[in-house]
Amino acid sequence: KYGMKFYFGLYDSGKYWDTGDMTWEVEDNKYVIDEVWENYGSKYKSFGGWYISGEISRATKGAIGAFHALGKQCKDISNGLPTFISPWIDGKKAIMGTTKMTKEDAVSVQQHEKEWDEIFDGIHDVVDACAFQDGHIDYDELDAFFSVNKKLADKYGMQCWTNAESFDRDMPIRFLPIKFDKLRMKLEAAKRAGYD
């Protein structure tokens, strides 16, 4: 009715979170992709693309193969509709499952670039965009990580989007809404980096 586009998020079996192995997601989604396209994608002009919902942060067992297989199946069945992923950056605020506020073994900008260069190299032909979640790094790290993200996306002909998290990871209560000043800092950093 309003000319908006809908991106369908693939099924998350939860097995990856328990095993660290993304190959399960490929098997479970083979049927989901076919069914969704048959019942919705082929019938509605608002169906704009696919969200490959396996969220990773680093070089993960089976991730390149899984993202490639899922992206290819989505594109093949839908005549090339766009696909995107939304990983997180393994920064010091990536502390799920712990009572700590930060962690010591956060990824460096250089290691992040190395790992995501390898991942993008293996998926860029079937994944059109990457929207890194921005909540796991500190505000003074935004420019460094965002500029690397944009550089890599440009290198591989992908779009670089932001996933501006609207909840606050700086609080011991998970998760309060973020103050607008903090959200604005993240959006302005994405703009400075030239995100699409």
What does each model-found stretch correspond to?
Residues 1-196:
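Glycan-processing catalytic domains of CAZymes
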